[in-house]
Amino acid sequence: MSKVSFIGGGSFGTALAILLAEKGNTVSIYNRDKKVVDDININRRNDKYIKNLEILSNIKAFDNLEKATENTEYIVLAIPSHTIRSICKQLKSKIKQETIIISIAKGIEEHTDKRLSEVIKEELNNPIVVLSGPSHAEEVVLKLPTTLVVSSENMNSASEVQNLFMTSFFRVYTNQDLVGVEVGGAVKNIIALAAGILDGLGYGDNTKAALMTRGMKEISRIGSALGGREETFYGLTGMGDLIVTCTSNHSRNRKAGLLIGSGMGVDKAIKEIGMVVEGVKACKAFYELKEKIGVSMPITDILYKVLFEKKDPKLGIEELMLREKKSEIF
């Protein structure tokens, strides 16, 4: 059995920590919030992020990064995308070079437009594996069948992580297309936020089907331009993740959109969710990126205006509907 350290004690990180602990691994969780650490260690719960859940005895929490990662074989980065670089800088002097870094965050770095594995690689010389796909913590802890994907520049490391997580209810595939896996997971948050806005405005199934289908095209378009393979975007980390994030009541991006569509301001909606809404950051980052490289992403354009220029969402939808006539396939 292995020692696995989770950086971040949020809902999905906690769900995966329990999965690995149930397989007999020794698991540590690093969290800066002393209340979360004490709740895990003393009460065997993590009620701030996922309620009514028992934390196994072979999981220990720390508010000290060095202690949490001591002699660890795997580090799971279960933190928001904008904190990845700073945490990796802190880890550099604390971990062994052979420790495998597993990223479960979804997004790109603002201002640099770098994928998260690229950010990690700039700061650490360790093997890096990305774990992504359609998965909500609330269903993982119930052991409902879930399928994800691991990808890496080193497929031996990817296979190792595949074996680490694989169970009878948690199936993990490998995919060599690291770019496609990361981009799909990041852009779908933009479309999920838009899907929530549609729900908040009271639009129906026809509208959401159109949004998801044309949103899938935007994922494929920007992903291919960045070097990803189109077939990846129609797999688990693209279409699969898009479906679950646009339709699930567990999705914080959809829930934030729902609040915005119902008339709540963007900042207030994010505060109401209480956790990072990656779709907001992703929208800004990919809007700036697609402007640089000349990729058409009309849904992202409109969502950017709604989020950052206070455009009326209904007028935005009308603008999308009245765009120049064209063929569906282009």
Curated annotation (Swiss-Prot):
Molecular function as annotated in GO: glycerol-3-phosphate dehydrogenase [NAD(P)+] activity; NAD binding
Entry annotation: catalytic residues: K188 (proton acceptor)
Residues at which sn-glycerol 3-phosphate binds: K106, G133, S135, K188, D241, S251, R252, N253
A Gene Ontology cellular-component term: cytosol
Compartments where located: Cytoplasm
Catalytic activity: sn-glycerol 3-phosphate + NAD(+) = dihydroxyacetone phosphate + NADH + H(+); sn-glycerol 3-phosphate + NADP(+) = dihydroxyacetone phosphate + NADPH + H(+)
Binding positions (NADPH): S11, F12, R32, K106, A137, R252, V276, E278
Enzyme Commission code(s) on record: 1.1.1.94
SUPFAM superfamilies cross-referenced by the UniProt entry: 6-phosphogluconate dehydrogenase C-terminal domain-like, NAD(P)-binding Rossmann-fold domains
Chief location category: cytoplasm
Annotated InterPro entries: 6-PGluconate_DH-like_C_sf, 6PGD_dom2, G3P_DH_NAD-dep, G3P_DH_NAD-dep_C, G3P_DH_NAD-dep_N, NAD(P)-bd_dom_sf
Gene Ontology biological process terms from the UniProt entry: carbohydrate metabolic process; glycerol-3-phosphate biosynthetic process; glycerol-3-phosphate catabolic process; glycerophospholipid metabolic process; phospholipid biosynthetic process
Entry superkingdom: Bacteria
Keywords associated with the record: Cytoplasm, Lipid biosynthesis, Lipid metabolism, NAD, NADP, Nucleotide-binding, Oxidoreductase, Phospholipid biosynthesis, Phospholipid metabolism
Class of enzymatic activity (EC top level): oxidoreductase
Pathway of action: Membrane lipid metabolism; glycerophospholipid metabolism
UniProt similarity note: Belongs to the NAD-dependent glycerol-3-phosphate dehydrogenase family.
Primary role: Catalyzes the reduction of the glycolytic intermediate dihydroxyacetone phosphate (DHAP) to sn-glycerol 3-phosphate (G3P), the key precursor for phospholipid synthesis.
Protein name according to UniProt: Glycerol-3-phosphate dehydrogenase [NAD(P)+]
Organism: Clostridium botulinum (strain Eklund 17B / Type B)
Gene field: gpsA
